[in-house]
Regions:
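Signature of N6-adenine DNA methyltransferases within the class I
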Residues: 4, 8-26, 34-72, 80-178
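Conserved residues in the N-terminal Rossmann fold of short-chain dehydrogenase/reductase
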Residues: 77
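Nucleotide donor/acceptor-binding cores
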Residues: 31
Length: 178
């Protein structure tokens, strides 16, 4: 495994069933669905794979992809952030990795700095990168449902991300589980 991906072994945060069910209910049926950090498939448990024309899931861990047993799913053993994707999605559901970019390799940080100009420098979290990349793959009338820490709502380092989200009118609803 690449050196910069070793840090991802420390950031597994699984989605509770109750939240996964709520998230899946917010998606619209049909079209293409993306899950960019599938992990053990918690977010897919409440999704009928036959309700979608195509489902793509990504993870860097083969052991997680091996646990996904639903039909009609394209499994990609790849780093979602660094993978070029030439399609757009009607639905995106995600629980991205939560890891400070400063804890990643210098090469990985440089890749992010070069390819994600919407981010400020400083204490940036990898989940910011996942949000931006997912939004770039979302169709204009698409739905993205994400569970994240609420830190991007107030962290100084997330100012550029907040402006990006608000300027492009990406936020329809926020549910805060404090």
């Amino acid at each position: 495994m690449d050196e910069h991906l070793l840090q991802f072994n420390k950031c597994d945060v699984f989605t509770p069933s109750k939240i996964a069910q709520l998230m899946s209910e917010k998606l619209k049926k049909g079209g293409k669905l993306l899950e960019p950090a599938v992990g053990t498939g918690d977010l897919l448990k409440f999704i009928n794979s036959h309700d979608y024309d195509e489902i793509d899931v990504y993870d860097i861990k083969e052991k997680y992809l091996a646990t996904i047993e639903k039909e009609n799913i394209n499994k990609h053993l790849a780093d979602f952030v660094q993978t070029e994707i030439d399609k757009s999605y009607d639905n995106i559901i995600l629980n991205p990795p939560y890891i400070r970019i400063q804890d990643l390799s210098p090469e990985y940080r440089e890749y992010i700095k070069t390819n994600f100009s919407q981010l400020e420098h400083g204490l940036v979290d990898l989940y910011y990168v996942f949000l931006i990349k997912c939004l770039s793959l979302l169709k204009e009338d698409g739905i993205m449902v994400a569970i994240t820490p609420n830190s991007y709502l107030y962290n100084k380092s997330a100012l550029a991300l907040r402006k990006y989200l608000l300027t492009n009118k990406y936020i329809e609803e926020i549910i805060d589980y404090q």
